[in-house]
Amino acid sequence: MIDTLPAFWAVIPAAGVGARMAADRPKQYLELAGQTLLEHSLDCFLGHPALKGVVVSIAEDDPYWPGLRYASDPRIQCAAGGRERADSVLNALLVLHAQGAGDSDWVLVHDAARPNLARSDLDKLLSELADDPVGGLLAVPARDTLKRADSHGRVSATVDRSTIWQAYTPQMFRLGALHRALAECLVSDVVVTDEASAIEWSGQAPRLVEGRSDNIKVTRPEDLEWLRQRWAGKR
């Protein structure tokens, strides 16, 4: 690990609706320990000395963002949320370009509903990728036995988990490379579920940086309940 961490921009796509949560609002605005998941996710970055700024992609008709304490923070800019995650991230990168960010600047993209990022994991990612020619992402080696299912919901095969990792965020890439990769995927109608998959499609191999398994993304109600119990010291 290097002694000096590289400066970086953070991008948080926050325009999704989180349908699987079946909540009365988008999941990034659900509360955990007195503030929203989005605010917790922002907290992971705003106290970091290497941060240059943050762009949050927000849905056009979002009624919740203006009421957050970070809505008027000068370190945070907003971008228009898009139909898909890739659109939202690409719009955020355009905002960074407009602010004078260069193609060689590092950008870290983080899920709005992933509030439990440890500072040690963030520093590890920055340190290990500082001189990497491609960039990479936090990830966790698969622990459970993995099964491939057929169309009838029955096991068709057991997957060798020795080379399988779960992709987490932040995902860290150079602004120019990520912009080109996402733009090319959108033009080619390639579906990408994260930034690393866009970089992969462009022919590059992102590096996997092992992180903590408790850096979970809130996707279902039980995820939020687990975090509430953990943060309350009950787990």
Swiss-Prot record:
One of its GO terms (molecular function) is 2-C-methyl-D-erythritol 4-phosphate cytidylyltransferase activity. Pfam families: IspD. The record marks R20, K27 as: Transition state stabilizer. Keywords: Isoprene biosynthesis, Nucleotidyltransferase, Transferase. Its EC number is 2.7.7.60. Belongs to the IspD/TarI cytidylyltransferase family. IspD subfamily. This is 2-C-methyl-D-erythritol 4-phosphate cytidylyltransferase. It comes from Pseudomonas putida (strain ATCC 700007 / DSM 6899 / JCM 31910 / BCRC 17059 / LMG 24140 / F1). The lineage of its organism: Bacteria, Pseudomonadati, Pseudomonadota, Gammaproteobacteria, Pseudomonadales.
